[in-house]
Amino acid sequence: MQIEDITIDTEEIQLDQFLKWAGVLASGGEIKALLAEHRIKRNGETESARRRKLHPGDVIEIEGMGAWRVARD
């Protein structure tokens, strides 16, 4: 699976903000649904908190959609 780097200009970003910033998902409702279905993983582990703080190097994978790495500018 190819991982796309998404650059942020802060030290950390919340999961829900990151997915919207990356253009992966448009709303918090979409994120909540995917979390409830256990389809989002952070660094290979199933994620359950939409406000989880992400840092450069973290990889987010959504089953059936792709993978994105938090990168720092």
Locate the predicted segments by residue.
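Low-complexity, intrinsically disordered short peptide segments enriched in small/polar/basic residues
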Residues: 3-5, 37, 59
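C-terminal structural segments of small proteins and small subunits
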Residues: 47-73
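A detector for short, charged/polar N-terminal pre-domain segments
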Residues: 1-13
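Generic detection of intrinsically disordered/low-complexity segments and helix-coil linkers/edges
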Residues: 12-15, 62
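A basic, amphipathic helix-loop patch mediating RNA/tRNA/ribosome contacts
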Residues: 14-56
